[in-house]
């Protein structure tokens, strides 16, 4: 009488588990990078959208429009080039370039997550002229995440108000983000 046994040996089972583990690890890495790419793209798109709104609002109102980094919707973060927590945009009715109760806020973007955004050195706010013209000098926003310099991108606004996405210069550093 022939006794056929069906099944796997312990060695075969362990080999299959090891292969599944390796494949899962590779898939997770790609998935994680895709999620970080999407978050960085979203932050860059929201920033570009606010720049466009500011130009339109300043032209429509005939007043200066200001965009500044902000932790909440109530005030600019004075002297900061860190836009990672978000920003506000408003029509500056009294010309002091700070958000006051009399000013008309038209955008508030709150960011969470692993994207770190910094503006060019010394650029703590963006002020659009009453005719909708941009501030008059180049401005670069650098967007970094937990992957560091290798995956950083920039949003560059030229003197004409046109913006483009690119890779940061070689000397640009990204903070360590956990």
Enumerate the predicted regions with their spans.
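Glycine-centered recognition micro-motifs in short, flexible terminal segments and loops
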Residues: 1-24
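N-terminal helix-rich module
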Residues: 2-3, 22, 26-60, 64-178
